[in-house]
């Protein structure tokens, strides 16, 4: 049994806490809101984020970082914009080096850093053993019901990756290892952009043909940028690429899909986030990916079209028309060029 802290008591943080508790680990779940922590400890529920799910007594909630000083592993499950502050706060409380597993999906606008890079920047080197990413098609609602789910873990250290695989894996939660840290993080982050686009086209009244086109061409965009950043193209055919893309673009559980649908129906980005009452990672990631694409001179037309809707005020139907009216191309044109560049490197 290990002492594990999970920072973030939303739906995904709570669901991962359940997996760890099922595996016999003692879990300290750090919540931002006092009422959430109290409910978990007293009523053993988290109705705000995971309605009707019983939380075992082996999960103890707190709002104080001071209560995680004795942990061996920290699972970080907070929005990308909160990563730096959350990690920075650990510098004053940790007593020894820890492994940080992050289950967040995003890229930081401006710096264009992946989450593992942000963690490495903020945590004192003497307090960090390794950063591991956990990603894949894994809706919290289904994980909490113990429905069969598969995910991928990756880090710079294969031995550490295997340790985290053992930490989480059970009969309902199957964990694969992957040595492509960049690819796993990029796939998990960028699929939120494509989910927004799929939801947007649904809001416009378009059907399955459009959704299939967005998903397929969206995966090509993810691959182009990912490979340029050093990822393996094979990773995007796996759980953290295609797998996560499918589940996020087709499920009612997907907040990015639902946000996109609202955009397609005419709501502004601000109205969407206010209506949902939670962070929509795909909005910030669209900004970061658009900036990266321009910097690296990579064509990402779906991302660019979505950026024009989110940040330039373009009407969704006009963005869709422009996307369809682009100059004709070979299906594998840009992806082939990027893969060739990687081989030459």
UniProtKB/Swiss-Prot annotation:
Keywords: Cytoplasm, Lipid biosynthesis, Lipid metabolism, NAD, NADP, Nucleotide-binding, Oxidoreductase, Phospholipid biosynthesis, Phospholipid metabolism. The keyword Lipid biosynthesis applies. It is an enzyme of class 1 (oxidoreductase). It is found in: Cytoplasm. SUPFAM superfamilies: 6-phosphogluconate dehydrogenase C-terminal domain-like, NAD(P)-binding Rossmann-fold domains. One of its GO terms (molecular function) is NAD binding. Disulfide bonds: none annotated. Catalyzes the reduction of the glycolytic intermediate dihydroxyacetone phosphate (DHAP) to sn-glycerol 3-phosphate (G3P), the key precursor for phospholipid synthesis. Belongs to the NAD-dependent glycerol-3-phosphate dehydrogenase family. This is Glycerol-3-phosphate dehydrogenase [NAD(P)+]. It comes from Halalkalibacterium halodurans (strain ATCC BAA-125 / DSM 18197 / FERM 7344 / JCM 9153 / C-125). The gene is gpsA.
């Amino acid at each position: 049994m290990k002492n594990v802290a999970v920072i973030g008591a939303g739906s995904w943080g709570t669901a991962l806490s359940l997996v760890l508790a099922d595996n016999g680990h003692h879990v300290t779940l750090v919540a931002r809101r006092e009422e959430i922590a109290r409910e978990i400890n007293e009523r053993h529920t988290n109705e705000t984020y995971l309605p009707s799910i019983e939380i075992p007594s082996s999960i103890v909630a707190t709002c104080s970082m001071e209560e995680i000083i004795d942990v061996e592993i920290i699972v970080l499950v907070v929005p990308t914009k909160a990563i730096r502050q959350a990690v920075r706060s650990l510098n004053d409380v940790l007593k020894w080096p820890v492994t940080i597993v992050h289950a967040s999906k995003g890229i930081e606008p401006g710096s264009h850093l992946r989450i593992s890079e942000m963690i490495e920047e903020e945590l004192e080197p003497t307090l960090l053993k390794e950063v591991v990413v956990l990603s894949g098609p894994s809706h919290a609602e289904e994980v909490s019901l113990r429905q069969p789910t598969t995910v991928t873990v990756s880090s710079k250290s294969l031995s550490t990756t295997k340790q985290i695989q053992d930490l989480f894996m059970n009969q309902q939660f199957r964990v694969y290892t992957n040595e492509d840290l960049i690819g796993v993080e990029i796939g998990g982050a960028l699929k939120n952009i494509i989910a927004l686009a799929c939801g947007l086209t649904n809001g416009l009244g378009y059907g399955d043909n459009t959704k299939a086109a967005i998903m397929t061409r969206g995966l090509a965009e993810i691959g182009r940028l990912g490979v340029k950043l050093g990822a393996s193209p094979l990773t995007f055919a796996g759980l953290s690429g295609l797998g996560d893309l499918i589940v996020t673009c087709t499920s009612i559980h997907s907040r990015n899909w639902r946000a996109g649908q609202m955009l397609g129906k005419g709501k502004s980005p601000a109205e969407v986030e206010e209506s949902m009452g939670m962070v929509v990672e795909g909005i910030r990631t669209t900004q970061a990916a658009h900036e990266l694409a321009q910097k690296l001179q990579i064509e990402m037309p779906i991302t660019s079209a979505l950026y024009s809707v989110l940040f330039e005020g373009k009407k969704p139907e006009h963005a869709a028309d422009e996307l369809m009216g682009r100059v004709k191309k070979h299906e594998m044109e840009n992806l082939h060029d990027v893969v060739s560049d990687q081989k030459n490197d």
